Amino acid sequence: MQNKKIVIIGDDIRQPTGVGNILRAISLELSQKYDIVQIAAGLDSSEVIDISESVSKATKNPKAYFKLYGTSEYGSLDLLRSVIRTESASAILIMTDPHRFNWLFEAEHEVRSLCPIYYYHVWDNTPYPKFLSSIYNSCDAIGCISKLTHECVTNVVTDHPCVKYTPHGINTKKFYPQDDKMISQNRKDFLGKDYEFVLFCNATNIQRKELSILMSGFNEFYNKLSKKNKEDVVLLIHTNPTAPNGVNINSILDDLYSDLPVLISDEMVLEPILNNMYNLSSCVINIASNEGFGLSTLEAVATKTPIIVNNTGGLKDQINEDWTEVVEPSVTCIRGTQQTPYIHADYVDPKSVGKSINTLYKRRKNIKMDSYLDFLRDNNFTEESMCSNISSQIDELIYNYKQPERFRFSKIT
């Protein structure tokens, strides 16, 4: 008997992007019982690539079926029609910002007459986004990545039949603690020195990540250290310093903080290298003014690395008093664009950031993280839990799907 097929739309699962990594885990889990087709953002639009053999090896499923249909962005209605017609899809799974799928939601009546839509969704902050109500109602099921997302969706579409809290999960076989000897060696190899205190930020260089506030906050902390202690601290930022939609990090450091010990890692790295980076860090920080979830800090927890977070969005879900320093927002205001008319932004003050860094710096050797695995498991923050929950939701979605009745117009005389 032939398996049912799932069409996944999002970043190419072979690319090391945040969405790509998550969709890879989900799709490999689903491939155990479904045939998978991905409309893969970032591929040439003429490409159709069969990766069934490599998926079979990865999952030990000799019957795996997995094809990639290329798209330069996030697909089109014509491409989806072609894929559904060719592959006979049983469900569609989408993941990324809702505005990427305007073309899909505008044609939801047509698409949902053929198969249901599952949206793995995150929203950064209040107010409840009423302008997304038509999008939420266009989906047959919505998996909410944070508790705040779940709160937003359920308050916008109060009678939606299937909205479930389904947090991101970390693969603890890819992100795990290393021993002190390896950490010391990695610091020497990667940083050029076995620093006593490494503050690490892994973030895309876009405005909401507030990297300029981070540098200012680190400066507040650094200037209060003794001359001797200054020699043994460093801020490591993994980002693109010249990203067109971000801040000019090089100019900020050259002109404003030329004496500040900051290292930039600007090359895309695979998960084993990222695991090294979390482990060599004394602390991982995320003070974004909008953050739907914040994978970097949860990945850090999986390596037994303490975290500093802004008390906003999905970062709230990750707070554990044993190993988290929380920076409370100093200002909350409304900002927006044409696509996102309104959303709260929670800004932290550099002095508060500096104070939190200093607090963790002083207590770092006394922090105990022996219960980190229990924390991940109890909060469903493991990749296994994420994939299992989404797989169950897809099963239920397909089982309960009923094709809408088609109406026929007759001439009335």
Model-derived regions: residue spans:
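A charged, aromatic-enriched C-terminal amphipathic alpha-helix characteristic of glycosyltransferases
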Residues: D346-S352, K362-S392
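Carbohydrate-associated surface elements
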Residues: L148, G169
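Conserved donor-binding/catalytic core segment of Leloir-type glycosyltransferases
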Residues: V7-I8, K193-K209, M215-F218, L235-I237
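Aromatic "clamp/platform" in nucleotide-sugar-dependent glycosyltransferases that forms part
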Residues: S289
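Acidic anion/phosphate-binding donor-loop and adjacent secondary structure
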Residues: P129-F131, T154, I170-Q185, Y195
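Nucleotide-activated donor-binding/catalytic signature segment of Leloir-type glycosyltransferases, i.e.
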Residues: E110, G246-P272
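N-terminal subdomain of nucleotide-sugar transferases
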Residues: M1-E53, E87, C387, K411-T413
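Short hydrophobic beta-strand element within catalytic cores of glycosyltransferases
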Residues: P306-V309, I319, E325-V326
